[in-house]
Curated annotation (Swiss-Prot):
Transmembrane segments: 116-136
Name of the protein this chain belongs to: Anti-sigma-L factor RslA
Record key words, sorted: Cell membrane, Membrane, Metal-binding, Transcription, Transcription regulation, Transmembrane, Transmembrane helix, Virulence, Zinc
Gene Ontology molecular functions: sigma factor antagonist activity; zinc ion binding
Gene (name only): rslA
Amino acids binding Zn(2+): H25, H50, C54, C57
Amino acid sequence: MTMPLRGLGPPDDTGVREVSTGDDHHYAMWDAAYVLGALSAADRREFEAHLAGCPECRGAVTELCGVPALLSQLDRDEVAAISESAPTVVASGLSPELLPSLLAAVHRRRRRTRLITWVASSAAAAVLAIGVLVGVQGHSAAPQRAAVSALPMAQVGTQLLASTVSISGEPWGTFINLRCVCLAPPYASHDTLAMVVVGRDGSQTRLATWLAEPGHTATPAGSISTPVDQIAAVQVVAADTGQVLLQRSL
């Protein structure tokens, strides 16, 4: 059985419905008109009743269901160009070149749409980058943390640890950073240490804890709201007992 040529509307007296469809029923030419919404209400109900029992017409409608979406993406100029380039549709059916022309036009339109979207996205990204750059520059204009020298800490309860401490005053308090190396032999136990800030009022605040691993340098850091001039000392202590091992008095 040969596939029918699909028409644009229901059969009429112009001879269009005389085209052979292979199954010789007059509904074979109604599929395109149904998909495009060109049938009258009565014809639409009649065709839908026919579809319930005709797999041929159901398949034809399925094949054409994407055409309205394709047509909706064409502008007036593209439709005019297709009309000029496509051969005239005669009573024997639609030209086989029409659908490829539609698809090519839609492809060009989508390509332009993707290009416009890409340009718009790039422009938005550029604006965002400029905003971030301005924000970073504005932030960098704020006072920077002054370089702070690393001060050695005195060994108090051990000779197996050595450390330096850097103390930086900030508008919000104090930032403290240690570089603590464990000098114990490889077979020594890995003790847990803690950094403690001693205030001039006698308060003690634990800022960080870490594991002392022989031969390795730990870099614990912490912040505290206490101003630098209110800090009496920074200590490294045994986390479990509180024994002072290293200390830097201020």
